[in-house]
Regions:
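Acidic/polar low-complexity flexible segments
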Residues: 30-92, 149-247, 291-335
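Juxtamembrane cytosolic interface motif at the C-terminal end of transmembrane helices
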Residues: 11-12, 25-33
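Short, well-ordered beta-strand segments enriched in hydrophobic/aromatic residues
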Residues: 86, 130-137, 280-286
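Beta-strand-rich interaction surfaces with strong enrichment in secreted/lumenal proteins
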Residues: 120-123, 269-274
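Short amphipathic, basic-aromatic surface patches that mediate peripheral association
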Residues: 138-146, 292-294
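N-terminal Sec-pathway targeting helices
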Residues: 4-18
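A mature extracytoplasmic/lumenal domain signature
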Residues: 126, 137-139, 161-163, 286-288
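Exposed beta-sheet edge/beta-hairpin loop segments within beta-rich domains
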Residues: 271-278, 296-301
């Protein structure tokens, strides 16, 4: 009996310590958790009049951002656009540039803990055929790599597809549309598919049944046989992230919250990126097609549109949720 009493006492003591430890962890988390600030575009001092004004949490994590005035973007109408396949076209020098501060994504894990890109420049224009946006930001050296320890530079533009959609990648029944460009994909277009031999030129060697030739066997040319592609599961299942014959360095996505990004196949969006003298210049282009749900939305209310931006610094190991972002930014489309 005495032994049973001692066992119960020990169990109660251990249980008590466990409860105390959990309580302390919870208290420390609450006490040290970064503050969350709601930041809503407010032209004229009223947020209610804007489509997509989110009531959800902001990802800035900085109270000062709440008081900072948001930039205003005007998508100018031109008779003739700059070249849609050349982000370095000198004609962009004649189009107004808006400088936009960036913040760290700190709403959902994995969060960005260190800001390495402070701001991004945006220019926007359209004509009867196309809508175009040019983004540029400082990047001392471009990052194209994609392996377990190295990551690619990237940038994205996001638009709400329904009034009230949070800028944090939308929400249930409040979708957003995104255009996502990646430096690695640009290199695929410019120089050919960046194969395993490109990442590990002096160390990679393997054997795949049914692949043509002897190792190293380039994925882009040695795996035409469907039997060989069984060993490349992403390619054989049509995963858009595994595409080896990419036609554009851009992906159109739809989302309704964190972790819900979905590829839009056969997208009409095009993009082109170029790195020059310590800066990336990325040009997005979208046909002016009234059947396109986003373009249709633009013309339903051209004075009260919005966009948000995201930038990934590959050299700083940005990827996924580890990114620099903006809140919704008011945008008007000139008629």
């Amino acid at each position: 009996m005495a032994g049973n009493d001692n066992s119960r006492r020990i169990a109660l003591f251990v249980g008590g310590l466990f409860v105390i430890a959990i309580t302390m962890i919870a208290v420390i988390y609450v006490a040290t958790r970064r503050p969350v600030v709601v930041v809503v575009p407010q032209p004229g001092g009223e947020a209610a009049g804007l489509p997509g004004a989110a009531a959800g949490p902001s990802a800035t994590g900085e109270a000062a951002a709440a008081a900072a005035p948001l930039p205003q973007i005007s998508q100018v109408r031109l008779d003739k656009l700059p070249a849609t396949d050349d982000p370095l076209d000198a004609a962009w020098d004649q189009i107004a540039t808006v400088e936009i501060p960036l913040d760290m994504q700190q709403t959902a894990a994995p969060m960005l803990e260190q800001k390495t890109v402070a701001k991004i420049n945006l220019q926007a224009a359209h004509d009867s055929q196309q809508f175009v946006w040019r983004l540029s930001w400082e990047q001392p050296e471009p990052s194209y790599k994609s392996n377990v320890a190295q990551f690619s530079d990237a940038v994205a533009i996001q638009f709400p597809m329904k009034d009230g959609a949070p800028y944090t990648m939308g929400g249930p029944d409040m979708p957003v549309s995104m255009m996502y460009w990646k430096a690695l994909w640009q290199k695929d277009i410019d120089e050919g598919f960046q194969d395993v031999t490109s990442v590990y030129p002096n160390s990679w060697y393997d054997l795949y049944w049914f692949a043509k030739g002897t190792g190293p066997q380039p994925v882009s040319s040695a795996f035409d046989d469907p039997a060989a592609r069984q060993y490349l599961t992403g390619v054989s299942t049509g995963n858009p992230m595994s595409t080896i014959d990419r036609k554009q360095p851009v992906q159109e996505l739809a989302a309704h919250g964190f972790g819900s990004s979905t590829d839009i196949p056969n997208s009409p969006v095009t993009a082109r990126g170029a790195w020059k003298e310590g800066r990336w210049y990325v040009l997005f282009s979208r046909p002016n097609d009234s059947v396109d749900p986003l373009i249709k939305r633009f013309f339903e209310n051209p004075e009260q549109q919005m966009l948000a931006l995201a930038v990934w610094d590959g050299a700083a190991q940005n990827r996924g949720g580890r990114k620099h972002i903006t809140n919704w930014i008011p945008m008007r489309i000139e008629k």
